[in-house]
């Protein structure tokens, strides 16, 4: 069934790419986009533009590890938000899907920047950032590092927290440290581009370069969400399923405590919802819609 859904969606995306932008149900314009980052990487995504945009608001939507712009949460949330009147741009990051990973985490800022630039070029204001799973680390980093004044708020779902700590929770401190030590040793020897076979537990195994490992988990990583959220001075929504076995719901509590003083952080915890919000999609949609409406009406 999952293969069939993926096949049907792939065919749909091909049809979009071969035909001019169309109006779905005469209310939402759907368009395949290809954007080039300032460092020369071409990214693909889907832009959804409602005929009537609620308060002229747009949402840039960022997937998590091994994800893409059309599966998992990205298969339903961008569409649901556009049906509610918000323009959405769901874009592949440069390390999308389950292929080998060689980029550094910090390169993600170029991917998010080109999406924000595109939404601003199209005239959307305010613009919000959405991140799912490891995408939460990406959008928190972008917001904290750039201080982009075009971003009016940040939405997070299923945040995994500090990525080295996540590995410790799966494999224990000794095993997680051994992998990081090996990667750091390779980088120190000028072999940062050497491939390593990395065990990701419930996510399977993947090829990472040593540079990629260190950029995600090293002591100087910029991916730490607890540090980054403390540097964000915009409203934040965090939605977490209480049955999430991939990203501990306690991470949300720690993010709340780490936020800058006086910043309004809304937390929604959904009983029974897992990491992908299976069977609870509407709960997530409702929470995101309510928060966005509240923010755009201010």
Where would I find each of the regions flagged by the language model?
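The serine-hydrolase catalytic nucleophile loop
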Residues: 66-78, 93, 250-251
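Short alpha-helix in the alpha/beta-hydrolase fold that links the catalytic acid
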Residues: 74, 234, 248-258
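Conserved alpha/beta-hydrolase
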Residues: 78-98
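Catalytic nucleophile-loop/oxyanion-hole region of alpha/beta-hydrolase
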Residues: 94-128
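Short beta-strand/loop motif that positions the catalytic acidic residue
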Residues: 232, 238-240, 244
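Catalytic histidine-centered segment of alpha/beta-hydrolase-like enzymes
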Residues: 273-283
């Amino acid at each position: 069934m999952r293969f069939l859904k993926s096949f049907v969606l792939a065919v749909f995306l091909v049809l979009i790419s071969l035909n001019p932008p169309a109006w779905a149900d005469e209310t939402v314009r759907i368009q395949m986009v290809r954007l080039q980052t300032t460092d020369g990487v071409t990214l693909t995504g889907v832009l959804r533009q409602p005929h009537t945009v609620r308060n002229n608001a747009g949402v840039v939507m960022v997937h998590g590890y091994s994800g893409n712009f059309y599966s998992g949460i990205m298969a339903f949330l961008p569409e649901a938000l556009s049906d509610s009147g918000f323009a959405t741009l769901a874009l592949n990051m440069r390390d999308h899907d389950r292929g080998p990973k060689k980029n550094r985490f910090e390169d993600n800022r170029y991917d998010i920047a080109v999406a924000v630039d595109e939404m601003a070029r199209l005239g959307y204001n305010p613009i919000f950032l959405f991140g799912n799973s490891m995408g939460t680390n990406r959008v928190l980093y972008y917001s904290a590092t750039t201080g982009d004044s075009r971003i009016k708020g940040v939405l997070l779902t299923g945040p995994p927290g500090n990525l080295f700590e996540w590995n410790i929770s799966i494999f224990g401190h000794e095993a997680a440290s051994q992998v990081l030590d090996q990667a750091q040793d390779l980088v120190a020897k000028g072999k940062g581009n050497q491939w390593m076979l990395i065990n990701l537990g419930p996510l399977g195994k993947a090829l990472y370069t040593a540079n990629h490992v260190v950029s995600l988990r090293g002591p100087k990583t910029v991916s730490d969400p607890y540090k980054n959220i403390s540097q964000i001075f915009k409203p934040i929504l965090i939605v977490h399923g209480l049955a999430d076995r991939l990203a501990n719901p306690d991470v949300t509590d720690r993010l709340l405590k780490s936020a800058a003083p006086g910043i309004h952080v809304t937390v929604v915890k959904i009983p029974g919802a897992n990491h992908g919000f299976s069977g609870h999609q509407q709960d997530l949609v409702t929470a995101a819609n309510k928060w966005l409406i509240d923010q755009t009406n201010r």
